[in-house]
Amino acid sequence: MTLNEVTISRAILEEQHRALIDHLEMDAAVIGGGPSGLACAALLGEKGVKCALIEKKLSIGGGMWGGGMMFPRIVVQEDARRLLDRFGIAYKAFEEGYYVAKSVEAVAKLTAAACDAGVEFFNLTTVEDVMIRGDGRIGGLVVNWTPVDMAGLHVDPLTMACTCTVDATGHDAMIARMVEKKGGALTVKGESFMWAERAESQILAHTKEVFPGLFVTGMAANAVAGECRMGPIFGGMLLSGERAAELVAERLGR
């Protein structure tokens, strides 16, 4: 067999073009590929939801890669240990109720779970606006290549339709802030101080539909609510992603 460079190019272009066309209309779009977004997308995919994960950066994983201050370890509390088991993430007990896992393995296992569940990934893709029709509900996303945004080029975007949007953009709560900025009935209070116990204990209450068609998960949920941050303990991120998936699936009737 002789390799042909044009055939390689054609394979990439045709397959990715097919994936993009297929996801111009979908059930759910998860914006942000951190731990909460990955967990949410993986669990939605397992429920048979047609789902894509859109990430503005080259790689997914959010803040999980770096663990705490570049030490590639994360902590998960007892309440979320079952999700480490569910995704096949190895861990060690540290003290009672505290479990330590490798951050790189955690990202890899969550990503693999989402891939295995049929989630389509669109990295290097920035959501610059949302689409709202006459019913006042978010029904789609306005997207462009991240390098276009970084370079400040004047290039019109394209639109992808989705029934449910999940803001998993972390501390910035970017999608929620877009809605707020454009006059939607949504107020983003912004995250509060570091207080791990409070942040972790309240995150499930903040994981909800905050605007018609828009759900928030992970640190985006706490940021919208004005809640505290938690640092490198990730149980709340996983539990919030699970809860967001349940809410979206319920809304979709799955």
From Swiss-Prot:
Positions with a binding annotation for glycine: R229
Required cofactor names: Fe(2+)
Keyword terms, alphabetized: Iron, Metal-binding, NAD, Thiamine biosynthesis, Transferase
UniProt catalytic activity: hydrogen sulfide + glycine + NAD(+) = ADP-5-ethyl-4-methylthiazole-2-carboxylate + nicotinamide + 3 H2O + H(+)
Record: residues binding Fe cation: D156, H171
Enzyme class: transferase
Pathway where this protein functions: Cofactor biosynthesis; thiamine diphosphate biosynthesis
The protein's Enzyme Commission number: 2.4.2.59
GO molecular function: iron ion binding; pentosyltransferase activity
Any Pfam family matching the protein: Thi4
GO biological process: thiamine biosynthetic process; thiamine diphosphate biosynthetic process; thiazole biosynthetic process
Record: residues binding NAD(+): S36, E55, K56, G63, V127, H154, V155, D156, M219
Subunit structure comment from the entry: Homooctamer; tetramer of dimers.
Family named by the database record: Belongs to the THI4 family.
UniProt function note: Involved in the biosynthesis of the thiazole moiety of thiamine. Catalyzes the conversion of NAD and glycine to adenosine diphosphate 5-(2-hydroxyethyl)-4-methylthiazole-2-carboxylate (ADT), an adenylated thiazole intermediate, using free sulfide as a source of sulfur.
Protein name, as recorded: Thiamine thiazole synthase
Originating species: Methanoculleus marisnigri (strain ATCC 35101 / DSM 1498 / JR1)
